[in-house]
Amino acid sequence: MIVLDTHVLVWADADDHKLGRKARILIDRLWPLGQVTVSAISFWEIGMLQARRRLRLPVSVAEWRDALLSAGVVELPLDGAMAVRALDLAGLHDDPADRFIAATALLHGAALVTADDRLLDWGGALKRYDARE
């Protein structure tokens, strides 16, 4: 199972060239198996980016989310265990969405697919794939 970082979800949906060949193959292989997941916090993060005009979706965040879930992306909900785990990620930067996404991957035993160098370089015990490869 893999957890897509927010920007990777956007790239995968848009078939963006920023998504590397290896990452695309991994996503395409796991998608039909129901093993491509996303933290629920990613939809909040997308909404915040859209509100700040840093991202434009052709539809509302709710419609975009529904379309992705209908297409087979699995949403992993937030819960108290994740909130506590997100607090306990020594050395990880303070971005709350990144902390929740990392905690989600850790608690589900999943690998994180990201292009965020801060997450890729973090020393924690999280399996990661560089989405640019």
Q: What is each residue range found by the language model?
A:
Residues 12-13, 18-19, 79, 96, ...:
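Hydrophobic/basic alpha-helical segments enriched in Actinobacteria
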Residues 56-58, 62, 69-117, 129:
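Active-site neighborhoods of divalent-metal-dependent phosphate/nucleic-acid chemistry enzymes
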Residues 1-38, 52-66, 70, 108, ...:
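Short, well-structured N-terminal submotif of metal-dependent ribonuclease cores
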